[in-house]
């Protein structure tokens, strides 16, 4: 089954689908339709490509029309979960869709309910299509088939013409049997080619075997035909080949399951997988029937055809024919001579006796010549048979020798391939080592870059230190200047400033001491670390030196081992060359002996011998060329191997040198870096010492500053004392005026002192500013110190990075040492492999010695067989001589000979059938071995696909069933409602109508009665009036006026009463008429309502009918799908039963919902179980595949052993068969000999009696002599016919010997020995299992016998449509089914 579903837009034809139960077209109409089907089918296979093109054409958001009549926008394009293949999701303009963008719980896009629909992209169009375009015009391309295609089909389907040199047979035989030349030499060629191709069949490239339409092929090894179809099919997955067979052994006429793939006669079409079909053009695939047909044609060849064939048998037959032709004119000449002698000597009886004697002598001479010719022919045939047997044995030996040599060459090739693999591995190792060396170089370069950066950093640090030194010198000068100023001016003030300065100086001193101690500790740790690193580097360098020395030693040992191995390889190759040369020499000697034996033969066999010589020379030249090519290949491979080994050694040396150089460079760089780092550390130490000296100088300055501060303190104390004195003086100023002058003087002094204080304050401010500047400078120095600390930290970090890099280098060196160790192990492995190869060479040499011993044994067997053949030839010559003696007096023995010929033909047919069976068995065995893996893969794929398809189809069917059930329920409810409404309305209208009618009828009856009564009353009154008038006129005189007035009053009263009654009746009539009008209007309204209800009912009936039709179409579709799912339903019977139960229980909605939830849960559980089962199955498949691979390997080994045993057994059985056949022939000939001896005795007695009668009746007339002559001529003709029969028998025996030799050469000698039942039972193969590629199942039937591709019954079923022929049946162009129009189609391809 194909993965992708075909697109819905098929070319709409009027042919029904295969599953539908509709009319079939008649034979007259079906013929052109069948002719057009191949052209339609030709465009069928690339449906998936067209579908992909449709998907590529459309874009999301594009406006399209579904089926040409439903407008909308594309919202989704791609694959879905509800069905395989490409789908398009469309949002329709109107709510005519089926969903809201989600199907089966998976959302693909969002839209309003009933506006979303999913369909195939092939059903979308960008324009609105009219109904005729959507329905009719699409059929044009599919229906119109060109006459060229039909003509081509008829030309291709015609059988190939037979060759001119073969006699024409009836039409069926020409179609059945492939053309084959009747030459026996060609048969021997094909036999030899088949032998060579038995060994080389597997080596034919796939490119040469690619099938094409029109190729001549074999299906299953026995059924010949022509390829008519190649590609994928709908009934099974994979590539299939449709073949039109030569014989009616097929299953169909090119169509399977309603889809036509090609056109042919019924029972001539057959579908098979591509791997089961083989071309006939290859020598290995010549059918056994072709060989048998060729043999039959050779046996039935006329002398005219024998003249055309230059084979040995034809030459012998030519000689026999020539002898018979040359003997006839001699007979006629002798007859003319005898007739002339009789004409001269008619006069007496003595003349008759002399003529009879002369005739007898002439007959004896003819018989002697015939015996000589027969003996020559027998010798030639026996010699040819011996030569053919020798050739067959020589070919067998040669083929075995070639196979052995090929096996050995294959072993050598495998060894060379192993050596090449080792080379590749060594090259990979070299490349890895190169990469590692490059990585090391890259890291060394990185280290050099980091060292350069460190050098730059050290230079910058040196410059900073120089600047700091300059700053320190300047500050020292400033301190000296401050000291001088302080010494020069020591005022009593500024005590507070000096205290703050002293505190700051003490803090700075503490910081400097801490920094100094930290710096000293770091320097000591760094020195210790550098010492340890240097020691570790020295150790690593020593280890690297030792590793490099070891690698060099190992390389030298490997070189020596490689040289030794190359020498051993060259020695082994020389030994092989010598052995091959000896084998070639022995083969040439054998061929020369065969040539000598051929040269001893008859001159007529020279053509065949020349062909054999040319074949042998060709084989020898091919063998020599192959040996030379193999030797050249070995030399080239050996030289290339040596060159590669040399290049590998050179590369190893280069890599080692590069490693040593890189190590030395790394060492030098490390030494230089260490030296530079030591110099830098010494510089930093010197600078630190200088800084310490400067710090000491600052301490001295601080001590001086303290002394100055103490002096200032003394001054301040003196000032305080002076102030106290001034206070005392002020107090004394009041008491003593004399002290004013002193006060003034003191004031002056005070003013001077104040001035000095002011000066001191100004100096103090200056000194404070200087102190601030000094503090700033100290802060800057602190910053510089922090920078130095940062630089030291950076240096420490660089040191740490260097340490890490040193560690990485150590690890790399360790890894290189490990790689060296691994290289050593690899080299040891290579050495071990070389030892293994040496052992293999020793084994091969021992096998060669065994083969030589086998050759000597075979030569001894050949000699024994030659002796046996000589004995058989001698026995055959004796038998032929006996037969010749018997045939001198032979009589009516033609019937027995024909029986013998018939028996021989039957035996030959049985032999041919056995050969066909053997070829079938061999092909089936090889095919089974090849197809085990394919079967497993197909089984997995088919199971997965079946599971997927089953789930998808199950979901689709469930959804469709739910939809159908909903529609059915709604339609049924609507129908019931409408029916109820209609029945109620009809019943109500009927009752009302009847009641109204009854009332009206009653009213009419009453009114009519009243009218009648009134009319009668009026009539009576009128009559009374007239009577009264007449009475009044008559009785005027007699009656009085009062009576008249009373009568008149009574009459007037009655008249008024009648008038009132009339008015009442008129009013009642008017009322009744009004009521009638209203009733009529109501009636009309009810009639209109009834008409409307009828129309509604008709519309609803039409809808119901359409629903029914849709339901029928859906039922048909469901039936088709059920037919398609029949195979799956066999596997899923339980699920089908559960679904059937659910279908029966679908009547109630509540039960449906409950069961739906239950089923969903069960489905989830089933899916889980299926996933678990799949996992288990995958595990089991993996284990089975492993076991299959193991069994296949064992089978291949056993097959190889069996083939060897078969080759030996075929030779022995061929000999047994020849011996048995000759024994049976000898027995039959002995029985014929006994019968012929009896007949000869009877003939001798008859001759004696004839002689007596001649002696007694010597004086008879010439009429008796003529009768005797006629009798003798008839006997001579009979003997000639017997000779011809014997020649034919000899030819048949020759053909039989050739067939036996061919069977022995083809390896089919097992079937010839059909009498050895015990041997057959022992060595019979197990019958292969049947397997169908379509159904993917074992043991049921073969692919060729699959019922799915069987042709349907030729008798079409009777039509079930019983409508009128004038009416047009509704036909849907979308579904291609009858029952509804395209406008009313509910497309199943949408979701």
Swiss-Prot record:
Record's comment on post-translational modification: Phosphorylated. Phosphorylation induces conformational changes by increasing the affinity of the N-terminus for C-terminus, resulting in inhibition of its function thus decreasing its binding to microtubules and DCTN1. Exhibits a folded, autoinhibited conformation when phosphorylated and an open conformation when dephosphorylated with increased binding affinity to microtubules and DCTN1. Phosphorylation regulates its recruitment to tyrosinated microtubules and the recruitment of vesicular cargo to microtubules in neurons.
Subunit structure, interactors included: Interacts with MTOR; phosphorylates and regulates CLIP1. Interacts (via CAP-Gly domains) with tubulin. Interacts with SLAIN2. Interacts with TUBA1B, MAPRE1 and MAPRE3. Interacts (via zinc finger) with DCTN1. Binds preferentially to tyrosinated microtubules, and only marginally to detyrosinated microtubules.
Name of the featured protein: CAP-Gly domain-containing linker protein 1
Cellular component terms (Gene Ontology): cytoplasmic vesicle membrane; microtubule; microtubule cytoskeleton; microtubule plus-end; nuclear envelope; ruffle
Membrane disposition: Peripheral membrane protein
Location(s), subcellular: Cytoplasm; Cytoplasm, Cytoskeleton; Cytoplasmic vesicle membrane; Cell projection, Ruffle
Swiss-Prot/TrEMBL domain comment: Intramolecular interaction between the zinc finger domain and the CAP-Gly domains may inhibit interaction with tubulin.
Region annotated Disordered, chain positions: 1-53, 129-182, 302-336, 1251-1272
Residue ranges with Polar residues bias: 146-182
Keyword Transport annotated: yes
Coiled-coil ranges (or none): 349-1306
Chain ranges of the CAP-Gly domain: 78-120, 231-273
Biased composition (Low complexity): 302-331
